[in-house]
Structure formats: structure tokens, C-alpha cells
Amino acid sequence: MLQPKRTKYRKPHRVSYEGKAKGAKEINFGEFGLMALDGAWIDNHQIEAARIAMTRYMKRDGKIWMRIFPHMAMTKKPAEVRMGSGKGNPEKWVAVVKKGTIMFEVAQVNEQVAREALRLAMHKLPIRCKFVKRGEN
């Protein structure tokens, strides 16, 4: 699964996903992309499931760029543990996705194939998304 090789801090503060994206708002690498219409924390399993769905549909033709990466550790305390006594242990890795972020890009396939591949990826993600073309968004 996706996770950073090393981090400066083991247990970071929770970064907000509210508001609009500052970067990654335009398609830079491919011809088509998947844009987030909401903000959310997307974990490494969801990103990997979306990537696998796209590659299987495209039958390994074309090229896929993942523009998000799960850099942030999410912590959780065990069940039935009293409040206090410190922050919980790292549970999973998440990417902070804000509204307007381009999450995936696709190239070297026709529009119909790219649209369907990105639609399949959309269903693996916990937020609303839309298909965009280069120069259109």
C-alpha cells in the first residue's frame, strides 16, 4: 500500500480538507483527469482501489498519473478506552484532498475509454468527482 518511507513526525495534527485547493487544479501531465468536487481525507486503500480499477479497464494501455499521495498518518485510540492519556496510535495513511484538486490523470487512450476508466475510479472514492479535459477546467 501507499505510505511515505519516512516522516518527520509520527503523529501529525489533523489537516483540514475544507476550502478550495491551492495547487493541482489543472491537468499537467495527461489529457483527461478526475477532479474532486468535495473535500475529504482519502486513505491509501481507496487510492489503490481506484488505480487498480482504471488499469484493469484500460487493459494496461495508456498512462495514469496519481496526483495525490497519502502523506498524513491518521491516529485512532482503541475501542473502550477512556479519554486522555495521549494521542492514539497511527491507524492509516490519508491524502488531504480539497475541492477542485485533480486526483488522477490519464493519457494515450481515447476519450471514451478514459471517461469509463475514471468513472470506475470515481465509484471507489468517498467524494463526488467529475471528468475533466485538458484546458477545459
From Swiss-Prot:
Residues in coiled coil: none
GO molecular function, one term: structural constituent of ribosome
One GO BP annotation of this record: translation
Record key words, sorted: Ribonucleoprotein, Ribosomal protein, RNA-binding, rRNA-binding, tRNA-binding
Matching Gene3D superfamilies: Ribosomal protein L10e/L16
InterPro entries named in the record: Ribosomal_uL16, Ribosomal_uL16_bact-type, Ribosomal_uL16_CS, Ribosomal_uL16_dom, Ribosomal_uL16_sf
Domain of life the protein comes from: Bacteria
GO CC field: cytosolic large ribosomal subunit
Known role: Binds 23S rRNA and is also seen to make contacts with the A and possibly P site tRNAs.
NCBIfam families on file: rplP_bact
Oligomeric form and interacting partners: Part of the 50S ribosomal subunit.
Recorded family membership: Belongs to the universal ribosomal protein uL16 family.
Protein name stated in the entry: Large ribosomal subunit protein uL16
